[in-house]
Amino acid sequence: MNDRSAAITIGGQEFELLLTTRATKEIAARYGGLENLGEKLMQSESFEMALDEIVWLITLLANQPILIHNLRDPDKRELLTTEVVELLTSPFDLAAYKSAVMEAMSKGTKRNVESENDEKTRISGDG
């Protein structure tokens, strides 16, 4: 697991949740931006729709590390589907995954200011 991801277990297998630029674009296309995500999830017209959205988001974030692996490695891994996530989880699991989703999204959007300051110090010669 890397420092930009959070881990969850689905059906006894650990998956990383990772917010990538690609995932951010898909979230933006579906919800109008990351800032609208929480509001849209809370405003789902029914419990079923809310579950569908959460399952979609978990599947999207869990597939990012698999897609990266498949890009770099000839040993391809199978992507998760929403159907698999639905079958191998319970509504209780989905509620528990909320903190991991928020952690992955927070890590994916945070800025590493310290490294920027280090770079500026090196360039200016003040360090």
Predicted regions and their residues:
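Charged interaction scaffolds used for protein-protein
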Residues: 1-11, 29, 35-49, 66-127
